[in-house]
Amino acid sequence: MAETETKHHPEHHDDDVHDANYQAPPEKTIEEIMAADQEDESLRRYKEALLGAAQTEKIIVEPNDPRKVIVKKLALVVEGRDDMELDLTGDLSQLKKQLFVIKEGVQYKVRIDFIVQREIVHGLKYVQKTSRLGVNVDKMKHMVGSYPPKKEIQFYLTPAEEAPSGTFSRGTYSVSSVFTDDDKHIHLEWDWTFEIKKDWA
């Protein structure tokens, strides 16, 4: 099963994930956020719109899971094709056995589906490092943003990336993904693989 609590690793992935010069603001509960700056009407309306139902009720989607962020799925999105999906709720060690095939040169996006429960989460980030034959060939880091608790699954879709192309680019690539936040909580990290081919088959 996926791990059931958020890990807090101040040093893990710091060089790749966190800006050493950035000081994250202190964590605040929903109650603290709503109580602050009440005299500012426009700010109050903004916070109400942002938090939605979370301002009046404690939103807990999965009571037996203590995490604030539960990452559900990764999908590779290519226009005109069915999404290629990885289930991130089971045995993460098995993900490398699921080989995605990507046609060289196509435009694709990565979508992360996740649940936020209990409290608002600040400064979510998605970092992906790609290597081939043990050599790092690409790294992308995306600021996902802050999200309130919701009963529905929320998602982040990266900007389009272009798959490598050409004879020497074909082959199998290893990917290490991390979903973290400003407070250096590692919500989930997982490894997966894809293969660049001349065509989809």
Name the predicted role of every residue range.
Residues 1-154, 159-172, 176-201:
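N-terminal onset of structured domains
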